[in-house]
UniProtKB/Swiss-Prot annotation:
Protein name: Large ribosomal subunit protein eL15
UniProt KW keywords: Ribonucleoprotein, Ribosomal protein
Family the UniProt entry places it in: Belongs to the eukaryotic ribosomal protein eL15 family.
Xref: PANTHER family: LARGE RIBOSOMAL SUBUNIT PROTEIN EL15, RIBOSOMAL PROTEIN L15
Length: 204
């Protein structure tokens, strides 16, 4: 087995004494750092390589932490229109997953880069930590590489904001195939709109 295979087997057993100790140390370290920061290297090189990262110019890894739990509805100045102040505010579940939120925040922080993918690196009682793989579309190493230069096209600007990354597609339900999958494409809202629309076709 190669070195990455051994790393992969270590990460499979996250509750082992070794991994729980390493994760406890790393989450402590990540809490001391800024919420979004550039990582000098990947914490999980095997996972990063699987998701498309190459250790060469043009690629970057940013680390981000996201608060765990649900999402409160943002209410301007506490205006709730006669209802109790917390009704319809708390206990709401966000439609997207936290990994998708992490990608979005990193994408807004470094808009000149393109989000390729992301992966989990740790969590504690309050936060989840993710590392996001980004590619620089203006770098020659990316533009001249036929395996990655598709991301340089303008259609892939801010793909993380449009649910086009792996985490975004999962949140949209696009990993489902077969029975009951037809109501998910092209999107839930678009499919619903098409089903509500009365179409009176004229045949000539």
């Amino acid at each position: 087995m190669g070195a990455y295979k051994y790393l992969e087997e270590l990460w499979r057993k996250k509750q082992s004494d070794l991994m729980s100790f390493i994760l406890r140390l790393r989450t402590w370290e990540y809490r001391q750092l800024p919420v979004i920061h550039k990582a000098s290297r990947s914490s999980r090189p095997d996972k990063a390589r699987k998701l498309g990262y190459k250790n060469k110019d043009g690629y970057a890894i940013w680390r981000v932490r996201v608060r765990r739990g649900g999402r409160k509805r943002p209410v301007s100045k506490g205006i709730v229109y006669g209802k109790p102040s917390s009704v319809g505010i708390n206990q709401l579940k966000f439609a997207r997953n936290l990994r998708s939120c992490a990608e979005e925040r990193v994408g807004k922080r470094v808009p000149e880069l393109r989000v390729l993918n992301s992966y989990w690196v740790g969590q504690d009682g309050t936060y989840k930590f993710y590392e996001v793989i980004l590619a620089d579309p203006s770098h020659n190493a990316i533009r001249n590489d036929p395996r990655i230069n598709w991301i340089c096209e303008s259609a892939h600007k801010h793909r993380e904001l449009r649910g086009l990354t792996s985490a975004g597609r999962k949140g949209r339900g696009l990993r489902v195939k077969g029975h009951r999958a037809k109501s998910l494409r092209t999107s839930r809202k678009g499919n619903w709109r098409a089903r509500q629309m009365l179409k009176l076709r004229r045949y000539r």
